[in-house]
Amino acid sequence: MSKKLLRALGGEAVWPPPVWLMRQAGRYLPEYRELRAKAPDFVAFCTTPQLAVEATLQPIRRFAFDAAILFADILLLPWAMGASLAYREGEGPVLSPVRDAEAIAAFRPRGAERLGAVMETVAAVKRQVGEAALIGFAGGPFTVACYLVEGRAERDWPALRRLLWEDPALFESLLDLLTEETVSYLEAQIEAGAEAVMLFDSWAGLLPASRFRRYVLGPVAAISARLRRSHPDVPLLAFPRAANALLAEFAAGAGVAAVSVDSGVDLPALARQLSRPVALQGNLDPWALLAGGTALEDEAKILLEGMRGRPFIFNLGHGVLPATPPAHVARLRELVAAA
């Protein structure tokens, strides 16, 4: 386990720490914009291995990050299960809402079997990625369920909230299905070459504590337990965004190797609260990266100084903003390397 990221995930306080960024492949890179123009349909782009491989590798070539994360989308799995999915400019993903037992029963099982193009991408990246570790990923079952029930991202998620409170049995049946499908999807990525896998629960912060434990922590812990049995040497990371006061409990109970943390949390303080050895990943504010200059330098140094001597992966609290100058990302890479 010589790759820096994998050593940190194994509990080693690697220094300087490994660094990669959420959305490190994306619209802030001119080479990505040029590539993206070749396939305007986003699902087609993600499921064309030649394009997805290139998108995955672009930030590795430019910045020599310690990890490459598969270029894909958290909604590819429900799409492969039969959900309608379209990406509209200015709106993001739009799906046909799933709000009754008949809609859940209409899903086709074994969605991972229809995502062979994603596995081709994983295998091809693994052959070319060099010293960077390759991270596969999926959406957390709760976050995927949010999109399926609501049909799109909404400010207050009214349909989702009504369903999970008024018909919890139905909502849990959807979560159970997504949990099973996610295990199979991540296992397929591992078998194709992923060296670590990550769950993105972008909407975990919507829930009160009791439902967070039931609908976020529970499914993640179940996925973690299954993966530890089938692939014990492959670490799992999880990003329960905006979980805040529940992060220490999540780290203790989810069984993951690392918890990724958003920018609203004092990362060194969280590290002191942990009851079990878990690597922490994060959590520079993406707006500090966008600003560059003194803001970037100061915030990066505060984070690095606070996490020295701990298992730590330097990342952002969320994805790279599209307007971020690539020169700022290059400077951040230098700051971490010089820590």
Residue locations for each model-derived region?
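N-terminal basic, low-complexity leaders that serve as flexible interaction/assembly modules and, when applicable
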Residues: 1-87, 326-339
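Generic secondary-structure transition motif, activating predominantly at the C-termini of alpha-helices
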Residues: 9-13, 33-40, 108, 164, ...
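Short, flexible, mixed-charge acidic loops at enzyme active sites
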Residues: 32-34, 83-96, 147-160
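Short, basic, glycine/proline-bearing loop/turn elements
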Residues: 34-46, 101-111, 252
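Intrinsic-disorder/low-complexity, polar/charged segments
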Residues: 41, 48, 97-101, 156, ...
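Glycine-rich, proline-tolerant flexible connector loops at the mouths of alpha/beta enzymes
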Residues: 69-89, 97-99, 105-111, 194-213, ...
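A gly/proline- and charged-residue-enriched helix-loop-helix capping module
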Residues: 90-127, 132
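Active-site loop segments of alpha/beta catalytic cores
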Residues: 114-339
